């Protein structure tokens, strides 16, 4: 063989290859309608369809939605929103891949044991069946039919979509998304997973969508997402700095307990029971030298500076010249053993504080954290989360109806009522899929947010530091005060003795109030006005001071005051889905022997 030449490999063969599966696809028109009623603010699942690998879906929708008859033609915007997601089955069930493939272990060749087989997680309808207007109803499951089985994956998908796209992680706990072979039972009170005898099946619920973000709803519950960052002062080998008290109060027999601002030992006119550094001496009788802690005087325990509880061994005696004098308690810190903060420690503290502040503002979901800290968008597929496909937005048009028939005291001529509807046609998405899963469509209706009970921040500028200064523009978050959303008398105090008006409701970026202007509601449009006309609008009206929590962040439009019949569903809708599906299957399934 010539130098440098190589012999061909004898292992060149086709045994490491398999033929490519070439599956012909066919197009199907799967257009259909969906008629329903629903209430504002809820996330209603109005579309669900299973997906096969190799599918391509193209979806458009046309709708006619009517709002229940209005008392007056309201002066507010109502927005109808549809949003569609793809949720792979592997995110909803841990054993999906083993189920659909039969398993990737050698036992799959020989096992005939049914225990090794998987079945799709399923639940059974309860006694009395599912109620109308429940999440089960909107998914299309039969209502008022008891004890029939159905799979649970689309319901798990709803909870997962809510957690990933709608939940405010600063204020709301995540919904349970079980991925095992069955949904566990839960405690009927707490909703937590439980193995107790009184545990009940988990009931999936229709969730409210959250309010759109504004000055109040985007407020943060704290200055940063994490512990406050301190600048430490170190001291001595012990890591402690000594604090010395210069005086303590006395206790005389029959003296009132309110003389004490902190506890000491009981006092005898002839003995001193404290050393110079504040520790007990042997004057306590049965109490050893150096004992520290609390002990009762007249059955009242007064805390000491140093630790555990000691027993009382005597009774206080009267004395006109007590060895300890009542008065203030000046103390000082001995900094001789301390060391200063280094510049590097200061840098670390400032940078960590900025990291906590950025995490609070951008969010803590992985995709949000990567986007906020690195400026990189992490695709839904790579983040192992539901994939947003597309959606639509349309406004509800309000049309006045003028009374032009006979006049009476209830409805004179020229009286205005109204009807409202939304009609639109939108292309939603075209998407090809490579794995099994579900397409879930969610429908919701929300109104613009306005407030009418707060004091705009500009009216509370009393100090020059309350005004904008460029020097302070990049300081940390600033408080949004309770009075800005719900103003009360300054005499209303909280348990700590602070005026409730001046207690923080939440926190916003520095000088956020200069960057937006709140809408106003005045005159008889105010809900607290005598003879109010608030049925003309949908501004928020709080019965009590709201708190920045899960209840506040959920959308709760006061639509009932504007409706002629508030106990009926807010909307009645008719949807038509123009739905084209290209699927890896023949146009017709013709029985025969052509494949054998």
Curated annotation (Swiss-Prot):
GO cellular component annotations of the record: host cell cytoplasm; T=1 icosahedral viral capsid
Matching InterPro entries: Capsid/spike_ssDNA_virus (IPR016184), Microviridae_protein_F (IPR003514), Microviridae_protein_F_sf (IPR037002)
Cytoplasm recorded as keyword: no
Annotated coiled-coil segments of the chain: none
Keywords: Capsid protein, Host cytoplasm, T=1 icosahedral capsid protein, Virion
SUPFAM superfamilies to which the protein is assigned, alphabetical: ssDNA viruses
GO molecular function, one term: structural molecule activity
Subcellular location: Virion; Host cytoplasm
Chief location of this protein within or outside the cell: virion
Family matches, as Pfam families: Phage_F
UniProt keyword annotation of Metal-binding present: no
Regions that span the bilayer: none
Function: Assembles to form an icosahedral capsid with a T=1 symmetry.
Family, as annotated: Belongs to the microviridae F protein family.
Name of the featured protein: Capsid protein VP1
Species whose genome carries this gene: Chlamydia phage 1
Lineage of producing organism: Viruses, Monodnaviria, Sangervirae, Phixviricota, Malgrandaviricetes
């Amino acid at each position: 063989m010539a130098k440098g030449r190589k012999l061909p490999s004898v292992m060149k063969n086709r045994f490491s290859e398999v033929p490519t599966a070439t599956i012909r696809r066919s197009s199907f028109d799967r257009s259909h309608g969906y008629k329903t009623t629903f209430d504002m603010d809820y996330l209603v699942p109005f579309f669900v369809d299973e997906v096969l690998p190799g599918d391509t879906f193209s979806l458009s929708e046309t709708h006619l939605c009517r709002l229940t008859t209005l008392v007056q033609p309201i002066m507010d915007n109502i927005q109808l929103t549809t949003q569609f997601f793809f949720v792979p089955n592997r995110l909803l069930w841990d054993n999906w891949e083993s189920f659909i493939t039969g398993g990737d272990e050698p036992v799959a060749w020989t096992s005939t044991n049914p225990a090794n087989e998987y079945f799709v997680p399923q639940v059974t309808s309860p006694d009395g069946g599912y109620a109308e207007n429940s999440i089960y109803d909107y998914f299309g499951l039969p209502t008022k039919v008891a004890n029939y089985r159905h799979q649970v994956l689309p319901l798990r998908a709803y909870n997962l979509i809510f957690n990933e796209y709608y939940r405010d992680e600063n204020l709301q706990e995540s919904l349970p998304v079980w991925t095992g072979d069955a949904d566990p039972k839960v405690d009927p009170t707490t909703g937590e997973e439980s193995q107790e005898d009184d545990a009940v099946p988990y009931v999936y619920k229709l969730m409210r969508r959250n309010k759109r973000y504004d000055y109040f709803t985007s407020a943060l519950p704290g200055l940063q997402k994490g512990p406050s960052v301190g600048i430490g002062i170190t001291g001595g080998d012990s890591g402690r700095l000594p604090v010395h008290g210069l005086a303590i109060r006395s206790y005389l027999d029959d003296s009132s307990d309110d003389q004490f601002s902190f506890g000491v030992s009981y006092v005898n006119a002839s003995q001193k029971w404290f050393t110079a550094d504040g520790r007990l001496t042997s004057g306590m009788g049965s109490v050893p030298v150096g004992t520290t802690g609390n002990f009762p005087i007249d059955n009242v325990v007064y805390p000491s500076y140093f630790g555990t509880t000691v027993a009382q061994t005597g009774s206080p005696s009267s004395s006109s010249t007590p060895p300890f004098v009542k008065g203030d308690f000046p103390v000082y810190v001995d900094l001789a053993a301390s060391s200063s903060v280094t510049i590097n420690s200061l840098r670390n503290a400032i940078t960590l504080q900025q990291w906590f502040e950025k995490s609070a503002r951008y969010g803590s979901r992985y995709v949000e954290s990567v986007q906020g800290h690195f400026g990189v968008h992490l695709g839904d597929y790579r983040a192992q989360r539901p994939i947003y496909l597309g959606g639509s937005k349309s406004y509800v048009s309000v049309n006045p109806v003028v009374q032009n028939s006979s006049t009476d005291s209830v409805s004179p001529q020229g009286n205005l009522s109204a009807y409202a509807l939304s009609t639109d046609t939108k292309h939603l998405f075209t998407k090809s899929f490579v794995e099994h899963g579900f397409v879930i469509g969610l429908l919701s209706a929300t109104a613009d947010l306005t407030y009418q009970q707060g004091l705009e921040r500009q009216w509370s500028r009393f100090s020059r530091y309350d005004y904008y200064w460029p020097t302070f523009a990049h300081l940390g978050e600033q408080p949004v005060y309770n009075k800005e959303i719900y103003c009360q008398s300054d005499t209303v105090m909280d348990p700590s003795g602070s005026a409730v008006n001046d207690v923080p409701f939440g926190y916003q970026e520095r000088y956020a109030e200069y960057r937006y202007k709140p809408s106003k509601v005045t005159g008889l449009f105010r809900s607290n006005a005598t003879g109010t006309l608030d049925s003309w609008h949908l501004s928020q009206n709080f019965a009590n001071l709201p708190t920045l929590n899960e209840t506040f962040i959920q959308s709760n439009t006061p639509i009932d005051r504007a409706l002629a019949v508030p106990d009926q569903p807010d909307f009645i809708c008719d949807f038509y889905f123009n739905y084209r599906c290209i699927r890896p299957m023949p146009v017709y399934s013709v029985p025969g022997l052509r494949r054998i």
